[in-house]
Amino acid sequence: MSHNAPLVLMILDGWGYNENDRYNAIAKANTPQWDEWWQTCPHILLKASGLPVGLPDEQMGNSEVGHMHIGAGRVIQQDFTRINEAINNGKFAKNAVFHEVIDQLKKTEKSLHIMGLLSPGGVHSHEQHLFALLALCNQKKFRSVHLHLFLDGRDTPPQSALDSLKCLNEELAKHPVATINSICGRYYAMDRDKRWERVEPVYNLLTQGKSERQFPDAETAIHFYYKNKISDEFVPPTLIGKEHSIQDGDAVLFFNFRADRARQLTSTFLDPLFKGFERKTLPKLSCFVSMTQYDKNLFTTTAFPPVPLNNTLGEVLSSHGLSQLRIAETEKYAHVTFFFNGGCESVFTNEERIMVPSPQVATYDLQPEMSAHELTKTLIAAINSRDYHVIICNYANADMVGHTGNFEATVQAIECLDQCMQQVWQALKNNGGKLLITADHGNAEEMFSEATNQAHTAHTSEPVPFLYVGGGWHFTHSEGSLIDIAPSLLALLGITPPPEMTGRILLEKNHAHA
């Protein structure tokens, strides 16, 4: 099916723009290809955080939200904002799912196990959502509640769990309904790469109370781990206080609102064909509540079900008979597929997908190039095949290596990406193709926080670049936001964006001078 010059949309995950060169791994890196484009090709900056991407004002962007908005071409109220609003307008406290679960447990005299990421990060969860659940349990005079808390240190400073625990203890003083029964770093509880050896000890802790160490309270445990140079993200599964594991008839409530890092742990309880590891015990739960839908094949009771989206970029390309390829390494595969399609599981007609396995290393600063070279080879083969009108690809390095806080490794990651971009453009040029480059949010352009005097491992609220390589077109605006990408890409293809896409077309064809 050899037809056309492909258009590639390249998403450089975590590649933000920062005027300040200090602690900026992108500015520090040697990037001859990027520098040449920045001097000679049309480019502007796009907003990728806060209100323009459906998040609360000044909330940093993230990969899920970024890809959703790039694909949707309109502002989508994010689950985070939706849940915040429900708390503020009283709908959260009236949510029928929560009431039914608690009423059932009161009747059977069983326990509710609330688990999730205790964090003010707002990327996968927010601790205020947990506090609202505790207030609801208190309102309903239900006190058989056990907390299994995952620690962040990735979307927050590496050692910040004690601040969150202080806030939690203040809430528990007001609403004395629950005890903290386990803690665990997100590295273990929220893996998304089928590294079941990380998830298994979490499952054993939750279902059998098994743990290498036990502490009387969470603070003592965290002080012990900090003393041993273990930061929040890497705290091993640890029993706190008296053992209260999940028993038959109990209910579980997982309060994370973002799906990708909640799926695996959820599947250990709910997947009848689960093969990740041998489960010594499988509690017969009365209910498993997830804050949002994690996967349509995991039958959780969902407190905030998804709002369907029509006419995302993938659907529009498909309805115009165009072929498209989505390609990424494991870490970001869900982002260029599920999230890019508006949180929709289905694959459109003429949409193909390739996943390049991410390397099996403990943390990506140990291999800053990740699988970028393999991804580039596969991408170049796809360009040369001329089988696809549009290719949407994601390079994970700036984000995943940026999250480690290792500056030198992140510089290496950026330099590797520059070489990859150069090779991809060579192939596109040979095939008469065009290239759009952008990012979903910032990260690598700010690697150290003077405010906390710690590595800055989280995302940023900086704008992201939007760069066009291929000649013949120019930008008509000096800035935009992520929702303008899909309409602009459709304009390059000569397609009128559908009315659902409220983003603007930022690109215009150059006029030939008479």
From Swiss-Prot:
Enzyme's top EC category: isomerase
Catalyzed chemical reaction(s): (2R)-2-phosphoglycerate = (2R)-3-phosphoglycerate
Cofactor comment: Binds 2 manganese ions per subunit.
EC number: 5.4.2.12
Binding-site list for Mn(2+) 1: D399, H403, H459
Key words, A-Z: Glycolysis, Isomerase, Manganese, Metal-binding
Pathway assigned in UniProt: Carbohydrate degradation; glycolysis; pyruvate from D-glyceraldehyde 3-phosphate: step 3/5
One Pfam family linked to the record: iPGM_N
GO cellular component: cytosol
Residues given in the record as Mn(2+) 2 binding sites: D13, S63, D440, H441
Sequence positions that bind substrate: H124, R154, D155, R186, R192, R258, A259, D260, R261, K332
Catalytic residues in the record: S63 (phosphoserine intermediate)
GO BP annotations, alphabetical order: glucose catabolic process; glycolytic process
Family statement: Belongs to the BPG-independent phosphoglycerate mutase family.
Quaternary structure annotation from Swiss-Prot or TrEMBL: Monomer.
Described purpose of this protein according to its UniProt entry: Catalyzes the interconversion of 2-phosphoglycerate and 3-phosphoglycerate.
This protein's name: 2,3-bisphosphoglycerate-independent phosphoglycerate mutase
Name of the coding gene: gpmI
